[in-house]
């Protein structure tokens, strides 16, 4: 059993990439929790962008999906172009949901823009991680 498993993680993140990913996932989740009035709602953010918390669900969901799955994919050795295709599919799904699917949904281009922004932020982060934050896993 000297040969490594082809299903293992081919790369391991540097400490800054791992902590940064957890921090950014936590921030996206806190933004999501701010939808309801309470401790997680930022008055400064509401003053800067008055309708922010009515659209933040799309941003948070898109960010959490792509950054969560994409980070694991990069550690598994999936090429960044495949992560880019997933980001494009997620952006297109945001557009399709907000413009074409009217069942249980009202058309809202601002929601689509927030979803695309969350996807773009996640892909930018993942591109940086792939470029600067991964090193080969010595166990494989």
State what each model feature region is.
Residues 1-140:
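Bulky hydrophobic segments
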């Amino acid at each position: 059993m000297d040969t490594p498993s082809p299903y293992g993680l081919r790369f391991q993140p540097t400490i800054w990439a791992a902590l940064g990913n957890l921090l950014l996932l936590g921030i996206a989740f806190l933004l999501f929790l701010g939808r309801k009035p309470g401790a997680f709602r930022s008055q400064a953010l509401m003053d800067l962008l008055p309708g922010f918390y009515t659209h933040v669900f799309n941003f948070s969901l898109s960010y959490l999906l792509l950054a969560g799955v994409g980070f694991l994919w990069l550690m598994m050795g999936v090429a960044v172009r495949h992560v880019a295709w997933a980001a494009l599919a997620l952006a297109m799904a945001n557009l399709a949901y907000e413009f074409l699917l009217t069942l249980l949904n009202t058309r809202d281009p601002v929601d689509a823009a927030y979803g695309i922004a969350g996807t773009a932020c996640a892909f930018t982060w993942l591109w940086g991680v792939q470029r600067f934050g991964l090193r080969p896993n010595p166990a494989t």
